[in-house]
Amino acid sequence: MIPRVFILLTLVALFCACSTLAAVSHIEVDCIPAFTVYLLYGFVTLTLICSLITVVIAFIQCIDWVCVRFAYLRHHPQYRDRTIAELLRIL
């Protein structure tokens, strides 16, 4: 079973990105001073970059978890330790 942290991190990052884009899509730029617009778009860019980095980190962690699980299950059964498997959340 895939740990819930991977799914949670991905969902939080996607929620932040989508909510930021939804909030910005309703703003009329003509009514706001230039500095505020630049500040707002800077915040949107920062939020999207952080969300993208979070998704990439969660994806790399998921790949690492799959590789560790594959390497552990490839060993001969007599060398498998149940406590290590529970610690790594493999079984």
Curated annotation (Swiss-Prot):
Subcellular localization(s) per the UniProt record: Host endoplasmic reticulum membrane
Residues in the signal sequence: 1-22
GO (cellular component) term, any one: membrane
Transmembrane segments: 35-60
InterPro entries the record matches: Adeno_E3B
Cited Pfam families: Adeno_E3B (PF03376)
Membrane topology, Cytoplasmic segments: 61-91
Keywords for this protein: Early protein, Host endoplasmic reticulum, Host membrane, Membrane, Signal, Transmembrane, Transmembrane helix
Record topological domains on the Lumenal side: 23-34
Chief place of localization: host cell
Bilayer topology: Single-pass type I membrane protein
Family, per entry: Belongs to the adenoviridae E3B family.
Protein function: Down-regulates the EGF receptor.
Protein name: Early E3B 10.4 kDa protein
Organism: Human adenovirus C serotype 5
